[in-house]
């Protein structure tokens, strides 16, 4: 819980419904990318993203994911719990609004969430629409509340079923075979990889994943628990664990530039391959975008300026390029953007122009500071 806690109230009226979800089932690929393996696993990410949003807001530090025997998924967190009070505009419980209205959620109310992930906000309602069944259990204000759905439609009104000292949200859903006709079985390794990734991106948050479909020879289910103390520095070390590092420590920075939180970690190894990863609000932007272009530009300009001023390029007979500086580089760039603009429904490329300048400035300052500590000198290949 190392992010600034939102001071304003997170209540039923924080939930804003933007539009219906009638055509989600007719055109699911518009919302989750495809109806194959990628889309199937994306359902899990959407639900977990809600828990991560609670972590970003400073209200959650434990998240669990369980693959059940029937290939349904259960996620649970210790956040505030989705509000269950009556939504003034919709006239039903805010929980039902969140679960049945596309684009409904506290993430659209910036008093509740400063930044958030999720697939363009379609989130858990999209998961609900594409599930044969879904059950939401809310632990909030001393009570336990629940509601079940069938292919996105409530089976009954939100009801109180008991008392509790816990707080948080639990969701169990089973993907609909009418939608996912080719694949319904979850791949543990795919989900595990994403949970590990999220733990690095959100240091201090404990994320567990358990597979209850099969026991090992000792009668135990496969389970992993991820929790990172150093965040991206640890992430880079994990990615580079099989490579020989040519600088002593991972170079890193964390700060805010032009109102945009930026975190960068990088290291050089003895290979000649470039290994760059970029994230926006915990979303893996596989196709990069303005944050990655800003990183490349800032890095190239700073290192080239240093190399020229130190005379390292005097004897070169060719023009050095950014590619030369990125040989053997493993780096991660992570930014938090209040209003991210993505190219494509599946969030693979960031389009915000202002992010490029922020990241470029951040990496320039980081490298200038590290140059003075002389750690970068040992990585020079010119």
Residue ranges: model-predicted function:
Residues 171, 322-375:
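Extended, well-ordered alpha-helical scaffold/bundle regions in very large, multi-domain proteins
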Residues 61-67:
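A conserved short beta-strand within the histidine kinase catalytic ATPase domain
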Residues 1-48, 97-99:
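Bergerat-fold GHKL ATPase/HATPase_c domain
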Residues 376-382:
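Single conserved hydrophobic/aromatic residue that forms the stacking wall/gate
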Residues 17-25, 68-69, 162-172, 264-280:
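Flexible hinge/switch segments at interdomain interfaces of large molecular machines
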Residues 2-13, 71-94, 105-230, 235-238:
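GHKL-type ATPase core
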